[in-house]
A protein has these predicted regions:
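Active-site glycine-rich loop that binds ribose-phosphate moieties when present
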Residues: 1-4
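C-terminal catalytic domain of Rieske-type non-heme iron oxygenases
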Residues: 9-10, 14-246
């Protein structure tokens, strides 16, 4: 056959494919992010993630280039205007920048994560998540097209499927700690609510990134400027694009 072998790896239930023979191994590529998250969850904890069969997936369509979705995910600058509900309890000033070195990922973290689910029910947490970090959650874009969210009680991967230069399919996969949290009737209402929350938040971004696509087509657009205070992670991604794609 004419099939050619390509390198692939599985990490956090995601399959990563590398068609370039001149790139480093995936283990080396992912090590900076994996090491960073060791302070939250151990390797044993990571093995506990289970995908939810009922409320573990949704997809969104965006009429824009995939890179705008990554740009948007990297920064918290837009929170007050795009996500007023989220910003009411996780304000822009509660976030911090993440700039992975070497330049392979970037994003933001929050210091006030506190699940806003109805009633007294709560999801089980990762057993080794430090008590002094229980209100920390991190949202990282792993270049080129994967967005990740790690919390004490659930994890998600939000990956982009570029259809063409101005149309992108977004796929959200949600995981919980153990099969009981992910699939039992006991936690079904909580899963439904968490699913609704994340779909609502991510849907709020679609109009914005589609507007970014339209804005780039304006003859008045001159390339734009980065905020030296708020756009550091986004600038990190732009540097990756220049180095690896352009």
């Amino acid at each position: 056959s004419n099939l050619k072998e390509i390198r692939s790896s599985i990490w956090l239930d995601l399959i990563f494919v590398n068609i370039s023979n001149n790139e480093i191994s995936f283990d080396k590529y992912i090590k900076p992010l994996s090491d960073r998250w060791e302070k939250f969850w151990s390797k044993k904890d990571r093995k506990l993630i289970v995908h939810s069969d009922d409320y573990g997936y949704f997809n969104l369509n965006a009429k824009c280039n995939w890179k705008f979705a990554i740009e948007n995910y990297c920064e918290s600058y837009h929170l007050p205007w795009v996500h007023p509900g989220l910003n009411s309890y996780s304000k822009i000033e509660d976030h911090y920048h993440i700039q992975g070195l070497p330049n392979r990922f970037a994003g933001q973290g929050t210091t006030v994560y506190n699940p806003r689910l109805k009633g007294k029910g709560k999801f089980p947490c990762f057993p080794n998540w430090p008590k002094n970090k229980e209100h920390i959650a991190e949202y990282v874009a792993l270049f080129p097209n994967v967005m990740l969210g790690v919390h004490k009680d659930h994890f998600y991967s939000y990956w982009l499927e570029p259809v063409d230069h101005k149309y992108t399919k977004e796929h959200m996969e949600i995981y919980y700690v153990g099969d009981k949290a992910a699939n039992s009737k006991k936690y079904k209402s909580l899963r439904k609510e968490n699913h609704k929350l994340w779909k609502g938040v991510q849907s709020e971004d679609v109009d914005i990134i589609e507007g970014m696509q339209e804005g780039r087509n304006s003859p008045s657009y001159n390339g734009g400027n980065f905020s030296p205070v708020m756009d550091n992670p986004t600038h990190h991604f732009h540097k990756w694009v220049v180095t690896n794609i352009v």
